[in-house]
Amino acid sequence: VHTVRFFPIGNADTCLIELANGRRALFDFADMRESGNVNDKRCDLEKELRDCLGDDKEIDVVAFTHLDTDHCKRAKEVFHLDHAAKYQGGDRIKIKTMWVPASAVLEEGVTGQARTLRTEARHRFLEGKGIRVFSRPDALDDFLKKRNIDPATRRNLITDAGTLCPEFNLEHDGVEFFAHSPFAEHCDGEVIVRNDSALFVQATFEVAGRQTKLILSADVDYETIDSIVRITRRNQNDHRLEWDIINVPHHSSYNSLGPEKGNNETAPTDNLKWLYEEQGRALVQLASAGALLLGRRFVKAASHAPQRLC
Protein backbone atom coordinates (compact mmCIF):
# COMPACT_ATOMS: atom_id res chain seq x y z
CA VAL A 1 0.00 0.00 0.00
CA HIS A 2 0.93 3.67 -0.19
CA THR A 3 1.25 5.67 3.02
CA VAL A 4 0.80 9.39 3.67
CA ARG A 5 2.14 10.76 6.95
CA PHE A 6 1.36 14.12 8.52
CA PHE A 7 3.44 15.10 11.53
CA PRO A 8 2.36 16.95 14.71
CA ILE A 9 4.57 20.03 14.39
CA GLY A 10 2.15 22.84 15.23
CA ASN A 11 1.65 25.74 12.83
CA ALA A 12 3.92 24.28 10.19
CA ASP A 13 3.79 21.68 7.44
CA THR A 14 5.52 18.41 6.61
CA CYS A 15 4.04 15.50 4.68
CA LEU A 16 5.86 12.27 3.80
CA ILE A 17 4.49 10.08 1.02
CA GLU A 18 5.79 6.50 0.91
CA LEU A 19 4.85 4.48 -2.15
CA ALA A 20 4.33 0.74 -2.37
CA ASN A 21 7.35 0.46 -4.69
CA GLY A 22 9.65 2.04 -2.09
CA ARG A 23 9.90 5.52 -3.59
CA ARG A 24 9.25 8.57 -1.42
CA ALA A 25 8.24 12.20 -1.74
CA LEU A 26 8.56 14.69 1.10
CA PHE A 27 6.58 17.92 1.02
CA ASP A 28 8.28 20.52 3.21
CA PHE A 29 10.43 19.93 6.28
CA ALA A 30 9.87 22.11 9.33
CA ASP A 31 11.48 20.78 12.49
CA MET A 32 9.77 23.20 14.88
CA ARG A 33 10.29 21.44 18.22
CA GLU A 34 12.29 23.34 20.82
CA SER A 35 15.15 21.03 21.71
CA GLY A 36 15.33 20.26 25.41
CA ASN A 37 11.86 21.58 26.19
CA VAL A 38 10.02 18.64 27.77
CA ASN A 39 6.74 20.55 27.57
CA ASP A 40 6.92 20.98 23.80
CA LYS A 41 4.42 18.51 22.34
CA ARG A 42 5.67 18.93 18.78
CA CYS A 43 7.48 15.87 17.48
CA ASP A 44 11.21 15.56 16.87
CA LEU A 45 10.78 15.70 13.12
CA GLU A 46 14.32 14.75 12.16
CA LYS A 47 14.13 11.61 14.30
CA GLU A 48 10.67 10.75 12.95
CA LEU A 49 11.87 11.15 9.36
CA ARG A 50 15.01 9.09 9.91
CA ASP A 51 12.94 6.36 11.55
CA CYS A 52 10.73 6.27 8.45
CA LEU A 53 13.73 6.09 6.14
CA GLY A 54 15.52 3.34 8.04
CA ASP A 55 18.82 2.62 6.31
CA ASP A 56 17.94 4.75 3.29
CA LYS A 57 19.78 8.05 3.01
CA GLU A 58 18.09 9.51 -0.07
CA ILE A 59 14.57 10.74 -0.83
CA ASP A 60 13.38 10.66 -4.43
CA VAL A 61 11.66 14.06 -4.28
CA VAL A 62 11.80 16.76 -1.62
CA ALA A 63 9.42 19.61 -2.35
CA PHE A 64 9.69 22.96 -0.63
CA THR A 65 6.33 24.53 -1.35
CA HIS A 66 7.76 27.93 -0.42
CA LEU A 67 10.61 29.24 1.70
CA ASP A 68 8.91 30.38 4.90
CA THR A 69 10.52 29.06 8.07
CA ASP A 70 7.46 27.03 9.03
CA HIS A 71 8.02 24.97 5.89
CA CYS A 72 11.82 24.60 5.90
CA LYS A 73 13.19 25.01 9.44
CA ARG A 74 16.44 23.05 9.96
CA ALA A 75 16.49 21.82 6.37
CA LYS A 76 20.08 22.97 5.93
CA GLU A 77 21.10 21.01 9.03
CA VAL A 78 19.47 17.76 7.90
CA PHE A 79 19.81 17.52 4.12
CA HIS A 80 22.82 17.08 1.84
CA LEU A 81 23.04 20.17 -0.35
CA ASP A 82 25.06 20.12 -3.55
CA HIS A 83 26.16 23.74 -3.65
CA ALA A 84 28.57 23.78 -0.68
CA ALA A 85 30.80 21.23 1.04
CA LYS A 86 29.75 22.41 4.52
CA TYR A 87 26.28 20.99 3.85
CA GLN A 88 27.61 17.59 2.80
CA GLY A 89 28.89 14.39 4.37
CA GLY A 90 28.02 12.60 7.56
CA ASP A 91 24.53 11.17 7.73
CA ARG A 92 22.83 13.98 5.83
CA ILE A 93 19.82 12.92 3.78
CA LYS A 94 20.29 13.31 0.03
CA ILE A 95 17.67 14.85 -2.25
CA LYS A 96 17.47 13.16 -5.65
CA THR A 97 15.15 15.80 -7.10
CA MET A 98 14.19 19.07 -5.47
CA TRP A 99 10.80 20.60 -6.27
CA VAL A 100 10.38 24.36 -5.80
CA PRO A 101 8.18 27.16 -7.13
CA ALA A 102 9.93 29.62 -9.42
CA SER A 103 9.81 32.15 -6.61
CA ALA A 104 12.30 30.02 -4.66
CA VAL A 105 14.82 30.65 -7.44
CA LEU A 106 13.97 34.29 -8.12
CA GLU A 107 13.29 35.85 -4.73
CA GLU A 108 15.82 38.46 -3.59
CA GLY A 109 16.73 39.69 -0.13
CA VAL A 110 16.19 36.37 1.62
CA THR A 111 18.04 35.27 4.75
CA GLY A 112 18.59 32.18 6.90
CA GLN A 113 17.16 28.85 5.77
CA ALA A 114 15.44 30.52 2.83
CA ARG A 115 18.72 31.91 1.50
CA THR A 116 20.45 28.53 1.78
CA LEU A 117 17.65 26.73 -0.03
CA ARG A 118 17.44 29.44 -2.67
CA THR A 119 21.17 28.99 -3.29
CA GLU A 120 20.68 25.23 -3.61
CA ALA A 121 17.75 25.67 -6.00
CA ARG A 122 19.71 28.12 -8.13
CA HIS A 123 22.74 25.82 -8.18
CA ARG A 124 20.73 22.82 -9.35
CA PHE A 125 18.81 24.86 -11.91
CA LEU A 126 21.97 26.36 -13.38
CA GLU A 127 23.64 22.93 -13.41
CA GLY A 128 20.59 21.53 -15.18
CA LYS A 129 19.90 18.54 -12.96
CA GLY A 130 18.26 17.41 -9.74
CA ILE A 131 15.49 20.00 -9.71
CA ARG A 132 11.98 20.74 -10.94
CA VAL A 133 10.82 24.36 -11.01
CA PHE A 134 7.11 25.11 -11.04
CA SER A 135 5.85 27.89 -13.34
CA ARG A 136 7.68 29.73 -16.12
CA PRO A 137 7.54 33.49 -15.58
CA ASP A 138 9.48 35.81 -17.87
CA ALA A 139 11.73 36.60 -14.92
CA LEU A 140 12.97 33.00 -14.96
CA ASP A 141 14.14 33.37 -18.56
CA ASP A 142 15.82 36.65 -17.62
CA PHE A 143 17.55 34.92 -14.70
CA LEU A 144 19.07 32.37 -17.08
CA LYS A 145 19.99 34.84 -19.80
CA LYS A 146 21.90 37.00 -17.33
CA ARG A 147 24.02 33.93 -16.63
CA ASN A 148 24.54 33.16 -20.33
CA ILE A 149 22.25 30.13 -20.32
CA ASP A 150 19.73 29.58 -23.11
CA PRO A 151 16.32 29.18 -21.40
CA ALA A 152 15.41 26.48 -23.94
CA THR A 153 18.03 24.20 -22.36
CA ARG A 154 16.17 24.26 -19.04
CA ARG A 155 12.62 23.80 -20.31
CA ASN A 156 12.70 20.11 -19.35
CA LEU A 157 13.17 21.14 -15.71
CA ILE A 158 10.06 23.35 -15.61
CA THR A 159 6.47 22.29 -14.99
CA ASP A 160 3.63 24.69 -15.73
CA ALA A 161 0.37 24.88 -13.83
CA GLY A 162 -2.16 22.51 -15.35
CA THR A 163 0.31 19.72 -16.15
CA LEU A 164 1.60 16.50 -14.59
CA CYS A 165 4.97 16.19 -12.89
CA PRO A 166 7.17 13.71 -14.77
CA GLU A 167 8.98 12.24 -11.75
CA PHE A 168 6.04 9.93 -10.96
CA ASN A 169 3.31 8.20 -12.96
CA LEU A 170 0.35 5.94 -12.20
CA GLU A 171 1.59 3.00 -14.26
CA HIS A 172 4.96 2.56 -12.55
CA ASP A 173 4.54 4.30 -9.19
CA GLY A 174 0.83 4.14 -8.49
CA VAL A 175 0.69 7.92 -8.12
CA GLU A 176 0.67 11.04 -10.24
CA PHE A 177 1.04 14.67 -9.22
CA PHE A 178 -0.92 17.39 -10.98
CA ALA A 179 0.37 20.95 -10.54
CA HIS A 180 -2.34 23.56 -10.00
CA SER A 181 -0.17 26.48 -8.94
CA PRO A 182 1.88 28.67 -8.93
CA PHE A 183 0.86 30.60 -12.01
CA ALA A 184 3.58 32.50 -13.87
CA GLU A 185 2.07 35.82 -12.78
CA HIS A 186 2.68 34.91 -9.12
CA CYS A 187 6.44 34.89 -9.70
CA ASP A 188 6.85 37.76 -12.16
CA GLY A 189 6.41 40.84 -9.99
CA GLU A 190 9.07 42.94 -8.34
CA VAL A 191 7.74 41.82 -4.95
CA ILE A 192 7.15 38.09 -4.54
CA VAL A 193 4.50 37.01 -2.03
CA ARG A 194 5.59 33.54 -0.97
CA ASN A 195 2.17 32.26 0.06
CA ASP A 196 0.59 33.29 -3.25
CA SER A 197 3.38 31.66 -5.25
CA ALA A 198 3.52 28.42 -3.24
CA LEU A 199 3.20 24.95 -4.72
CA PHE A 200 -0.37 23.55 -4.82
CA VAL A 201 -0.75 19.98 -6.13
CA GLN A 202 -3.20 17.11 -6.35
CA ALA A 203 -1.82 13.60 -5.86
CA THR A 204 -3.83 10.71 -7.30
CA PHE A 205 -2.92 7.30 -5.85
CA GLU A 206 -4.02 4.02 -7.37
CA VAL A 207 -3.98 0.54 -5.83
CA ALA A 208 -5.77 -2.42 -7.44
CA GLY A 209 -7.89 -0.12 -9.57
CA ARG A 210 -9.01 2.05 -6.66
CA GLN A 211 -8.03 5.71 -6.61
CA THR A 212 -7.48 7.95 -3.59
CA LYS A 213 -6.91 11.66 -4.06
CA LEU A 214 -4.92 14.05 -1.90
CA ILE A 215 -4.63 17.83 -2.20
CA LEU A 216 -1.57 19.56 -0.73
CA SER A 217 -2.19 23.28 -0.65
CA ALA A 218 0.69 24.85 1.31
CA ASP A 219 -0.13 28.38 2.52
CA VAL A 220 -2.06 29.73 -0.46
CA ASP A 221 -4.78 32.27 0.29
CA TYR A 222 -8.43 32.24 -0.77
CA GLU A 223 -7.80 34.41 -3.83
CA THR A 224 -5.25 31.93 -5.19
CA ILE A 225 -7.51 28.96 -4.50
CA ASP A 226 -10.41 30.83 -6.06
CA SER A 227 -8.34 31.31 -9.23
CA ILE A 228 -7.33 27.64 -9.23
CA VAL A 229 -10.97 26.55 -9.02
CA ARG A 230 -12.09 29.03 -11.68
CA ILE A 231 -9.39 27.99 -14.17
CA THR A 232 -9.81 24.28 -13.47
CA ARG A 233 -13.57 24.42 -14.01
CA ARG A 234 -13.19 26.56 -17.11
CA ASN A 235 -10.95 23.86 -18.58
CA GLN A 236 -13.46 21.15 -17.58
CA ASN A 237 -10.92 19.51 -15.28
CA ASP A 238 -13.15 19.23 -12.21
CA HIS A 239 -11.68 15.79 -11.43
CA ARG A 240 -8.33 17.47 -10.81
CA LEU A 241 -9.82 19.07 -7.71
CA GLU A 242 -11.48 15.96 -6.30
CA TRP A 243 -10.11 14.88 -2.96
CA ASP A 244 -10.35 12.25 -0.25
CA ILE A 245 -7.75 13.95 1.95
CA ILE A 246 -6.97 17.65 1.88
CA ASN A 247 -4.24 19.43 3.79
CA VAL A 248 -6.02 22.50 5.16
CA PRO A 249 -4.26 25.57 3.69
CA HIS A 250 -2.12 27.85 5.83
CA HIS A 251 -2.58 25.84 9.04
CA SER A 252 -6.35 26.47 9.05
CA SER A 253 -6.09 30.25 8.61
CA TYR A 254 -9.34 32.05 7.81
CA ASN A 255 -7.51 33.78 4.95
CA SER A 256 -7.58 30.52 3.04
CA LEU A 257 -11.39 30.53 3.11
CA GLY A 258 -12.47 34.10 2.54
CA PRO A 259 -11.65 37.79 2.96
CA GLU A 260 -13.25 38.32 6.37
CA LYS A 261 -12.70 36.40 9.58
CA GLY A 262 -15.98 35.29 11.14
CA ASN A 263 -16.70 35.27 14.86
CA ASN A 264 -17.26 31.51 14.96
CA GLU A 265 -17.00 30.46 11.32
CA THR A 266 -15.49 32.12 8.27
CA ALA A 267 -17.75 32.19 5.24
CA PRO A 268 -15.95 30.77 2.18
CA THR A 269 -16.19 32.27 -1.28
CA ASP A 270 -18.47 30.41 -3.69
CA ASN A 271 -15.56 28.66 -5.39
CA LEU A 272 -14.04 27.54 -2.09
CA LYS A 273 -17.42 26.35 -0.86
CA TRP A 274 -17.63 24.22 -4.02
CA LEU A 275 -14.13 22.83 -3.44
CA TYR A 276 -14.65 21.88 0.20
CA GLU A 277 -18.31 20.88 0.17
CA GLU A 278 -18.79 19.28 -3.24
CA GLN A 279 -15.40 17.92 -4.31
CA GLY A 280 -14.71 15.77 -1.26
CA ARG A 281 -15.21 12.08 -2.03
CA ALA A 282 -15.95 9.01 0.12
CA LEU A 283 -13.01 9.13 2.54
CA VAL A 284 -13.15 12.90 3.10
CA GLN A 285 -10.54 13.74 5.72
CA LEU A 286 -9.02 17.12 6.48
CA ALA A 287 -5.45 17.19 7.73
CA SER A 288 -3.66 19.84 9.74
CA ALA A 289 -0.22 19.53 11.31
CA GLY A 290 -1.51 21.24 14.43
CA ALA A 291 -4.66 19.14 14.78
CA LEU A 292 -3.23 16.62 17.22
CA LEU A 293 -1.86 19.40 19.41
CA LEU A 294 -5.00 21.53 19.39
CA GLY A 295 -7.59 18.79 19.62
CA ARG A 296 -9.32 19.81 16.40
CA ARG A 297 -11.51 17.33 14.61
CA PHE A 298 -9.16 16.72 11.72
CA VAL A 299 -7.32 13.54 10.85
CA LYS A 300 -4.64 12.99 13.48
CA ALA A 301 -1.31 14.32 12.29
CA ALA A 302 1.04 11.72 13.70
CA SER A 303 3.73 9.61 12.12
CA HIS A 304 2.58 6.61 14.15
CA ALA A 305 -0.92 6.96 12.70
CA PRO A 306 -0.34 7.33 8.96
CA GLN A 307 -3.10 7.33 6.38
CA ARG A 308 -2.81 4.09 4.44
CA LEU A 309 -4.10 4.36 0.91
CA CYS A 310 -5.24 1.03 -0.47
Where are these regions (language model features)?
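Flexible, acidic/histidine-containing loops and adjacent segments that form or flank the divalent-metal
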Residues: 1-2, 57, 73-223, 295-296, ...
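C-terminal regulatory/interaction regions
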Residues: 11, 263-267, 281-284, 289-310
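Acidic/histidine-rich helix-loop elements
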Residues: 29-43, 252-268
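Active-site metal-binding motif and surrounding structural segment of the metallo-beta-lactamase
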Residues: 37-98, 235-255, 285
